[in-house]
């Protein structure tokens, strides 16, 4: 999803990310230079993603604001959607895998607990356990348009509507996923050299800013 959407974000829009999985997934891909991005990492928790998105969107009602977050972060802050000032320039991509997927992948220490991860760490099964109607009905009853996808084909079918530049209606686009697929995607990305390529690009950009002497100084500090 990040790969498909990142390069297609409308020029001049803004995008807010949930922490960890949402932010990391998009970090592997470039977004247009005119797009501003933000993430609520101050407290390093799930709180406040939707509230921050709403507040920013209120300041610039003529500008599109996108939000990308997982189900736990969404349900933690879902009361923000009921705010009477909720605008028509907000697009929310809700990645619903039914748990805190972050704790199940191989890079997280939590994965060593195996079958105990879901019930005791990843909060699996809460909030409707990937109900197909819970978020849909909540959004529609608040006057927010709803889209959903349970496959790549369905996601691509709804993607253009989600990215439309009309600022006369807001969307919640709920994509149902499986943690096993997300974890495999992460494993493939981190083992194909893409991460190394990204690090090299970052290194080159930093070098262009601080120069050779600056890079040498940074290397001495890191040693």
Residue spans of the language-model regions?
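Active-site pocket-lining segments that scaffold enzyme catalytic pockets across diverse folds
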Residues: 1-22
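Thiamine diphosphate
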Residues: 28-223
């Amino acid at each position: 999803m990040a790969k498909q959407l990142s390069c297609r974000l409308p020029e001049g829009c803004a995008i807010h990310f949930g922490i960890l999985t949402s932010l990391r997934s998009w970090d592997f891909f470039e977004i247009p230079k005119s797009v501003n991005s933000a993430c609520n990492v101050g407290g390093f928790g799930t709180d406040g993603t939707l509230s921050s998105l709403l507040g920013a969107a209120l300041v610039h009602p003529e500008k599109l604001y996108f939000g990308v977050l997982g189900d736990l972060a969404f349900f933690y802050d879902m009361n923000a959607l009921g705010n009477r000032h909720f605008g028509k320039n907000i697009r929310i991509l809700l990645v619903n895998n039914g748990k805190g997927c972050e704790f199940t992948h191989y890079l997280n220490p939590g994965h060593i607990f195996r079958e105990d991860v879901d019930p005791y760490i990843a909060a699996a099964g809460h909030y409707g356990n990937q109900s197909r109607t819970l978020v849909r009905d909540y959004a529609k009853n608040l006057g927010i348009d709803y889209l959903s996808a349970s496959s790549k084909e369905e996601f691509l079918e709804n993607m253009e509507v989600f990215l439309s530049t009309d600022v006369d209606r807001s969307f919640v686009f709920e994509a149902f996923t499986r943690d096993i697929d997300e974890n495999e995607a992460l494993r493939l990305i981190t083992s194909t050299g893409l991460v190394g390529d990204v690090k090299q690009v970052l290194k080159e950009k930093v070098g262009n800013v601080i120069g050779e002497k600056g890079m040498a100084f940074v290397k001495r500090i890191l040693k």
